[in-house]
Amino acid sequence: HDALPIYGLCGLIIENQEILKGDKREVFDGMWSSSLTDSTSKGKPDIEAVDLTTRLQDLNNILECTTKPIIFDGDTGGKIEHFVFTVRTLERHGISAIIIEDKVGLKKNSLFGTDVIQTQDTIEGFCNKIKAGKASQITDDFMIIARIESLIAGKPVSDALERAFAYVQAGADGIMIHSKNKSGEDIKEFCLAFRKQYAHVPIVVVPTTYDHIYESELCDWGVNIIIYANHMLRAAYPAMMNVAKTILENERALEVRELCMPIKEILELIPGTK
């Protein structure tokens, strides 16, 4: 799941939230450190404007609250010469994986699609970045997952597959395939074709636009990791806006009482406060 702007609180939610479906316990398996969520919560555009050191401070707050794996949204990964240090730093902090996208130049959010210029790296260039990152690791545990932007850039599934095969050969530990198509059919086509070539390489998807598809169906396509990338921030922001607007309208807080959790509950939310 995505990281909330209140990072430690998000860690607590993901660590502790669970439901029972019949006799089956459902929980979140890990956390996604989203660069969109990270930058938006700081009032910055999603263009890699928030540096690694700042993002690591937030990650440390999450790591105080959770033992679950964290996947770091690495955007483009930056210059190869800088990426090797990013890998070592994340590895040292206990982050489980980084996902980097095969784009170059100023980062623009993928969900803009072809409304903005989306420039893909060459296959050779991105393979070199993957190889350099893998060579810089101290342990074998850290994962570098290659995010393919072909479908975002308006290219066919065949281009995405060509890149995926090359990136795995270069050492990528997994493949993330992204699309803003609402049907999910292009994702399905990619996953089924990729699985014929590689039976065990993890596939990651982010069903923000094709959110009608159940996890079970995605798994049938061969998907291993499903990231709900920004939903908690998108839920929190309208709620906060509504409270602020209602207070302005009524010049008191009574009307927002039913929108807020009781003071007693917030005081007792974090162990050790009382």
What kind of feature is each model-predicted range?
Residues 2-4:
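Short, small-residue-biased leader/transition segments that mark boundaries at the very start
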Residues 7, 73, 94, 133, ...:
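Conserved, mostly hydrophobic/aromatic
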Residues 9, 231-274:
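Extended, intrinsically disordered, low-complexity segments
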Residues 10-16, 78-91, 209-223:
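Catalytic cores of alpha/beta
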Residues 13-72:
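Active-site cofactor/substrate anionic-group-binding motifs, chiefly glycine-
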